[in-house]
Amino acid sequence: MRRAAGLSLLGGSGALLALSLFYGGGTSQDRLFWIGAAASLLAGLGVAGSELGATGRIRLDGQGRAALALGLAFLAWSGAGLGWSIAPDRTWAFLNRGLVYLAFFALGLLVAAASPRARTATALGLATLLLGVVGWALLGKVFPGLFPDGGRVARLRSPVGYWNALAFLCALAFPLGLWVVTDRRRPGPVRAAGSLLLYLAAVALVLTFSRGGLVVAAVAVLLWLWATEERLESLGALVAATVPAAAVAGWATTRAGLVDDLQPSPVRAADGRWLALVLVLGAVVALALSYAADRSIERLDPASRRAWGPRLGGALLAVALAGAVAYAAASGGPERWLDEFRGSGEVSQGSARLAELSSNNRWSWWQEAWTIFLRHPGQGTGAGTFEIARRPLRQSDVVTTEPHNLALQALAEMGMVGLSLGLAASLAALAACRRALTCLHGEERRAGLALATVVPLYLLHALFDIDWDLVATSAPAFFVAGVLLGSGQRQARSPARPLRAMAALALGCALTYSLAAP
């Protein structure tokens, strides 16, 4: 029974993550209701089952409990803002969104308690979902009818609905793909799928034209190389996938039907057919290079592998630094970069944006958030109210719901208390994730290392975008955090606690009602 309950939890959680990624509807509150209600009810049932002994009991160590307590305090403070919010309905919506993410966190804890191989199953499942996401995104370019509104704005964003969010998911695919590819114990087809994930994620990442996404992807790779012992294997797989991906993406940027706005359907369809051919050819090259690199590395003895990893990594780093120096010399240096970053002009939506340094209005929004904080330093204006609070301050007609920086958003909307609680919860979660990895061994530890990149990457991306407002980015991050914080805890039978089970069910129903309430 415990095994069946654990599989049901894992399957239900996977289905909810798939819904979040493919049908999250961007920042839509309507989609959040259905996904959040299902997550809340499943979490309530799961906790009730755990308290009755149907699954493993949730166990959190001291750092995990501290992270959970601080997160709950952050949500409680956002809810307390209903008493002074300038837009209580928006504050209520912010609180509801946070409670939905808490439900995903609880599901992660339940999955971790239900299965001793929860980390491996979660990493494989998330990698599979991300392969589906990037595959569907590129399929929308091959068949334009699958890409809603792709004729008006060409930047790749389906199925998530927002290009920067899709770029973030592409970045998450790199550590997971490298984890799959570098595990020689896995069957050949599974490792080949990992290579395809790396290749397709790299192509899709470029076609989002997201500069922040590229930065987060680079950090993701660096985190994985720092954490893993298979550095040479990872570098080989990375080069094998990204070289043909760069060629395919570079070719795609020359086709009007793929990257230019307002193109007629025949042009988009024709270029889509060519893209299909080029993608397949690139995939063949990527798989061939990956196989060749793997065979070459396999011939080396372990000592040589350990020696060549830093050498190859150093060479790639030197090339990157040389490119950065050349770009700095050609673009005028840091002072000009700062001036361009703080400029108020909007960035183009095409491939040329990748070479631009403008913050695309973010600098102005950050200044507005700071000004709002100075006027309301203690309590803020109420969670979710930035769009209204900035109206007397804004100097352009550009509308934004958030300042594209979660820390400044918390500062403006919830004051110093909200920011302090949010920062403390984030740091506690990072520390708890790191502590949890020490409890894992073997394959579970390798999977945990890949998953452990998700939380810091989410926090990094949230410093210059609206990740909190997107269930497609937040649900996986909170679920993974739960899986990690529940890692390594002993699976022990304990007496059933029916009162706690009833309380868990009541909380799940209460959250569902809160989502439905106006």
For every predicted segment, state its role.
Residues 491-518:
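N-terminal alpha-helical interaction modules that lie
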Residues 99, 136-147, 323-375, 379:
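Aromatic-rich transmembrane-lumenal/periplasmic boundary elements in polytopic membrane proteins
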Residues 173, 405-406:
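Transmembrane beta-barrel architecture of outer-membrane proteins
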Residues 162, 351-400, 407-410, 414-421:
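TM-adjacent membrane-interface loops and short helices in multi-pass inner/ER membrane proteins
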Residues 59-68, 306-307, 498:
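Interfacial transmembrane-helix boundary/kink motif in multi-pass membrane proteins
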Residues 1-25, 33-49, 72-82, 88, ...:
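Alpha-helical transmembrane segments of multi-pass inner-membrane proteins
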Residues 48-56:
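C-terminal ends of transmembrane helices
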